[in-house]
Amino acid sequence: MAPTPPAPLTVEKIRADVADCLGEDPADIPVDENLVDHGLDSVRVMALLERWRREHGVTAGFADLAERPAIEAWAPLLGAV
């Protein structure tokens, strides 16, 4: 029996994971704003990326996410549906 492929990320899951990482409510994290302005740093980006690689099979690199730290910019890079 073949292993089940990982579930794709959604914009809401990305938002929820970022909010969890920052100790915030997802409703307080806008999808179109720079996440650095909300306290996201490189260590947290790496932690999120490793989690998404493990749980969702994401292949994006750190530099891709660091270049434009906003959920709406990350969604296509992370294969969000």
What are these model-derived regions, one by one?
Residues 2-81:
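Phosphopantetheine-dependent thiolation modules in NRPS/PKS and related acyl-activating systems
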